[in-house]
Amino acid sequence: MAEGETLVAKGETPVAVLPGAAPADVGMCPQRTERLLSVLRSEVARQRLPGAVAVIARHGRLALCEAVGALDPAAGTPMTPDAIFRIYSMTKPVVSVAALMLMEQGELLLSDPVARYLPEYGKQEVAHMVDGAVQLQRVRQPATVQDLLRHTAGLTYEFMGSSPVQRQYAQARISSLERSNAAFSQELSALPLMFEPSTHWEYSRATDVLGRVIEVLSGQTLGEFLHSRIFVPLGMRETGFFVPPDKHARIAEPFARDPDGGVQMRVIDVRQPVALESGGGGLTSTAMDYARFLQFMLNRGELGGVRLLGSRMVDFMTADHLEDIPVFSPASRALLSPGHGFGLGVAVRRALGMASMPGSPGSYHWGGRAGTTFFVDPAEDLFAILMLQAPNQREHYRLLFRNLVYAALDD
């Protein structure tokens, strides 16, 4: 992106403008910034990566917004900066912000039991293994709204293991997009918990439940609330739970088959509205739209004169809320690398060392199942986004991208 350009997609009215800058003007080495793109282009040439959009912003200015590779590798169409991606779990920070907005309005407390808003969660049971058999016991302490936000509610994901509870998730087709948020919540509440709430961290469908809480409190669908209260104020015109027909040609696609194992790549169909507006993983967005959201976060709740959250609330959201709460499963442990805790919707860096990737204490990040990823480093006044659709290579590219971004900082 050339100096002086702004973070506004073609055909958009400027709303949340992020001015462009030469990398050197924001403390980045031009040659090392270009090396990042060269590495991504090399991955495309090796047919390891279908295509990607990379964004780096520092000191409120956009130093990089570039597309590489193919938008749709089957069709051979080139990637464009305004490509639309399935962002999966990068939905979670957005929905977490929505819940905290309601908290700031006095609509909820984080200490409130989930059952206060969703009565079906008032009779939950926990699965215990006794002599090789599952026994169900009533929860001693019901899950709270904070448990939903920080993934300590006793819930799980069916694809993260094969425990008896996870098998019940699969048998109930809990991942189906064909039921409403209300019906999903009812179905999930009837399934046993993996552990007592507040005792462990397990990545889970908790943010899907949080989305239903938002619906009950607001009287709107989750999509309506996010659109009116977050997307419109921040100028995120390309973000939603499905892609309308006039934008289908901009949807980024993965390889038909995984370059590592040859298995067929499956991603959700985002061309039609779905019944379930998944608060944990249903949004589609562009790199530029999500950049607006991250600049809002880096600004501690404000963008372009629009304040959606108080500055202290953003600090609270991005603080570590786990402390000594242990991680429950190996699958969840893989998501929180050493030196990290978890806040209210994002992983949070606790220490400079220990982790396998660079980053300042207090930085935070998350990603999506199809490969999208972001990180925000307040100490460096920096955020970066990598948008791609390469599900099985996502961990490799997240680490590679992070390394290359920090290598380019030279002030």
Residue ranges and their predicted role:
Residues 34-41, 60, 85-117, 123, ...:
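Active-site SXXK
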Residues 9-33, 344, 348:
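Short, compositionally biased leader-like segments
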Residues 29, 92, 286:
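Short, conserved phosphate/pyrophosphate- and ester-handling motifs at nucleotide-, phospho-/glycolipid
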Residues 15-16, 116, 123-358:
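Short, surface-exposed loop or secondary-structure junction motifs
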Residues 374-376, 381-390:
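Short, well-ordered beta-strand elements
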